[in-house]
Amino acid sequence: MGSWLSEVQWLFLVSLFVAALGTVGLYLAQWALAKARPPPRRRAEPDELRRRESDTLLSWILTRDSWGNQWQAAWVTALNYEAEKRGGPLRLSFQKDPRPQSLQLTVEKVSSVVKSTQEKVVICHVVGETLQFLVSAGPASATGSECQLYDVHLSPFHLKVEFHMEEKREDIQIRWSFTHVPETAIKIQPQAPGEKQALGVNMLSEALEDLFKHLVNAASPSVFLSTKPTQVKEAQSLQCPSSTAQEPCPPKPPRAHELKLQVKNIRVSLINHPGASGLSHVCVAQLNDPEQRFISTLVRNTTDLSWEEEFTFELNAKSKELVLQISQDGCSSEGLLGIATIHLDLFRKQPNGPQTFRLISGTEPDSLVLGSVTAEFSYVEPGELKSWPAPPPVSAAKIEKDRTVMPCGTVVTTVTAVKTKPRFDTGRATPLNSESPVRTPVTVKVIEKDISVQAISCHSAPVSKTFSSSDTELLVLNGSDPVAEVAIRQLSESSKLKLKSPRKKSTIIISGISKTSLSQDHNAALMLDYAASMDSTNQGDATSALCHPEATEASATTPPEENEPAQTLPALKPRENDLDSWELEKESPVASWSGPALQEPDGDELSESSLSTSELGAMKKHKGGLLRKGAKLFFRRRHQQKDPGLSQSHNDLVFLQQPEGRQKKGATLGRLLNRKLLTRHRGKHTMNGVPREPCI
């Protein structure tokens, strides 16, 4: 029994030992597996997330182009300061490498240090691929031409960057320093050394490596980063580099259709003399779009041609080319002296200021060069339009000519001149006008109507009075005088036009003899027969009209709106106040109305004429007789007897055929004045309250 218990006890102890060994082995196996297996990822803490955000922000700041330009320039300044401070027999001068280089900076290990409640420092380590410098090395006593230029490369490079931020400051000070690591390689290589100097330069390069390491480690450059809040436009302007070496930021493109291009002071310098003397040259400036053309004044043939005129062009988005043509006497391509083509850049507003261009013989690029053209260009924006000096007031004149050829061969010409009030001419030149805005001449408008043929009866008729649309009293002689009737018709038509602010209106009526004889002019002969037939038809009506001149109304020559019952004309016994008005008016009208436009260009012989007084200003209507101020007067001269062999006028022929008693005395101005003087002594003789002329 005792032996059996001892065996059981031994087996139990052995089992416990084996179990202990198994447990130890299991733990060892789990430990080995845990070592071999990668550690599980832990959930990111909030601090790590903030750190990643700060790394991204700093990386974005350090990759900006403006930052790269500033920190390289600051580093070059710090290296030159340290080199000058160190001194020694070898003088070093660092420069920024103008060649483009990519600065890819990676931010690592960002840490934050709080120095005080108002200042905070953020420290980070930055790694870059390659950094390039230019260094000029030479003896201290050597001149600039004896120094050798070297290229310095650092790859890779490690920097320690510190951001110093203060609460009351809007700028962040950034400092950095070079961190030396074993893998950083410094390479110094001379630029194109000579064969004799190659050995000495290589030895100097090895000495420069140690010196450069010391200077890089000692330099501590710094810049300021602005954190001031700005508007979008200011932020766009800050993106432009401030360095003068960089190309300036192009301005905002202007609105081309609002710009104006001014070209002035054009001067042409020719290599050779133009040739024949006595010729004049002209400059033609032409823009492609919108098409505008300006022509300068003529300049005598000299070696240096110049025009001081100013041309203003309207521009749009398609304005690309301006052509200056120099030609002789404004001729076409045959007299072309040279062409200068100017390309316009409205985005940069070029050309601007005085510019010089080649003057070539043709439009081809390989044309012969004849000289140069210099002109001054300027761009005017809407708010900068130059205010032209106010020119003196000018008056506008309107001259209207109306010619009528009657069947009898008489030419009746009516010339009416109207001068308006002086006005201020703004001088606004159209794009196709070549005159300077300040040199706008007095406006003269000439209207000349075509010559027409009128078949008018030549019998006497009563005289009546009517008013035109321009408040001008017209004396209507219905049939009594064909010349006066044609003139009244012409004046009635012209008086329909309402003029603005008339100052002076003068009318002259001229009737002349046709230079072509009736025997040579077949058309005039036919019209003569037609007029003779009308004379025989209307003879009865004219005879009755002679006995009753006061009862005839206005004829059909009066405008349609004037066909109202006309007033009976007191032609022979005017009132006393009418004569006084005539005496005040008779001196100035004829003498004041003068000018080359009143001369008859045809040069016809004058056999009979009518004259009217001038109307000064806008006159008011007055109730009165014929000879009042502002009234139009038409009167005839006494018909002159001529030899039938010396006259070709049908009126003269008819006059010679008629007896002396049949000639009707016209109501001339002399008769009117004589009758007026007689009435002062004899009194006024009236019939039914209206003076009338007895039948002749």
Curated annotation (Swiss-Prot):
Gene3D superfamilies: C2 domain. It is a single-pass membrane protein. The modification Phosphothreonine is found at T440. Residues 573-588 have a biased composition (Basic and acidic residues). It is found in: Membrane. Residues 45-238 form the SMP-LBD domain. One of its GO terms (cellular component) is membrane. Its main location: membrane. Residues 241-357 form the C2 domain. Keywords: Membrane, Phosphoprotein, Transmembrane, Transmembrane helix. The modification Phosphoserine is found at S54, S436, S581. Residues 551-611 are annotated as: Disordered. Pfam families: C2, SMP_C2CD2L. PANTHER family: C2 DOMAIN-CONTAINING PROTEIN (PTHR21119), C2 DOMAIN-CONTAINING PROTEIN 2 (PTHR21119:SF7). This is C2 domain-containing protein 2. It comes from Mus musculus (Mouse). The lineage of its organism: Eukaryota, Metazoa, Chordata, Craniata, Vertebrata.
